[in-house]
Amino acid sequence: GKFVSITKSVTIYYPHEYLKGVEVVDTPGFNDPIVSREERTKEFLKKADVVIMMLYAGRPFDATDRDIIFKNVRQCGIGKVLVGINKYDIPYCSETNPEDENQIKEYVKTEIKKACRECNDNTLVEILSDVEPIPLSAEMALLSELPMSKISSSEAWNFAWKRYCSNFGISSQAEMYKWSHLDNFVSAVKSMVENEKNKILFAK
């Protein structure tokens, strides 16, 4: 928005029991045209116990993603990596070469294993060896929560709603949420927080 140029950070609190003592940071990412943002990302990574890496399903785990993990994440002492594959609907609904969720996931797992074989960092290889990528659609999840009146009044939202309904045979917001697979991602985050926090901290 209009305040991006003067905003250093935004803090949001969410009173959920399993998030007690947990801080989630949405970093600017890498390859940002503003160098200072990339430097801030590296600083945050040095303090992080877990990295949530969100890939784009249109080109999952490409050379850029590989560089992020093997050139940046490996230097920061990360205890765990959680991989999401956003916009899984793009290859899923491809007219020329459609792929289901399992095919998308297996492709990313194969690429990660291939990259691991080329890496000499045993610690990072161990961290990535049990990664289970999770396909999801953040836009479908958002559409499942927005008021239908808002969706109907927006040309962009209405177009997206109709496209998903047509491609997935969806007729309600409950079905839209189910097909978003956001629950799978939330469950993975929750499991990591509740079951592996001590193990991650001990490993570091």
Predicted regions span which residues?
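Mixed-charge, glycine-rich, non-catalytic linkers/tails in nucleic-acid processing enzymes
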Residues: 200-204
